[in-house]
Amino acid sequence: MDKVTSEEFLITLLLSYFRIVSFLFTFPFYGSFLIPNTIRLYLAFALSFAVLSFINITPVKVNTFVEFLVYALNELLFGFSAGLILRLLFDALIIAGELIALHTGLGFLQMFIPGMTQMSLFSGFFTLYGTLIFLSLGGGEFIILGLAESFKRLPVGSFNIFYLNPEVFLNFFYESFRLGVKIAMPLILTALILNLVLAVVNRFIPQMNVFMVGLPLQVSIGLIILLLSLPLITITMSNHFQDFFKVFEYFIQSFKSP
């Protein structure tokens, strides 16, 4: 391998590294501070080297440093975009947890998960629970394979910001919000019915302190409904994750090799 080929290989390796590392730092699971930065950097380098070893990638020729910076920014943008789609998927679970906490009277309970902002107890529960379901469905392997496929569809140095379709991200945002509301819907309806019943009771028995009776009742019934609806929530998450696999695959395959 001559000097020029070695330089081209090193440049291609660095550009591949930029794409993968920006994806891993955005992806909810790998981007969590539960995984040290050093591990994530080493993992990104290992994946970059594996991609160049097992996928036939044409080395990138760079004439100037400015051209290299443009390529690097494009690769960072692509990795960030792919990771953002996954983050929108898991944000649906946070939305569901916040809605449930709001309608069960437990919104004041907060927890801290490293790598994420402070969130309600239910948001933390659904985030961890959804992550387990995602990994049990082979989501981790699927994402890595999808990222490797992106190097075939869109070789290093060929991405352009104009390839991104804003409508795709808007659809993901809509589906994320819809999934969050769908998961929280049983608890929302239960809280609505309970509040109506308490309003009627307070109308006929004004001497009763509705707040003293309603809050423990709301929490107890909310937890019971959550436990009863957990199998249905699991099925909903699984179906949505499987649909997401197809959509993410379509997102990767929508790019054409130049």
From Swiss-Prot:
Cellular compartment(s): Cell membrane; Bacterial flagellum basal body
Membrane-spanning residues: 9-29, 42-62, 65-85, 125-145, 181-201, 210-230
Domain of life: Bacteria
Sequence similarity: Belongs to the FliR/MopE/SpaR family.
Statement: the UniProt record of this protein carries the keyword Nucleotide-binding: no
Keywords for this protein: Bacterial flagellum, Cell membrane, Membrane, Transmembrane, Transmembrane helix
Keyword ATP-binding attached: no
Organism name: Aquifex aeolicus (strain VF5)
BP GO terms, sorted: bacterial-type flagellum assembly; protein targeting
Mode of membrane association: Multi-pass membrane protein
Gene Ontology CC terms, in alphabetical order: bacterial-type flagellum basal body; plasma membrane
InterPro entries: FliR (IPR006303), T3SS_IM_R (IPR002010)
Protein's job: Role in flagellar biosynthesis.
Name of the protein in its database record: Flagellar biosynthetic protein FliR
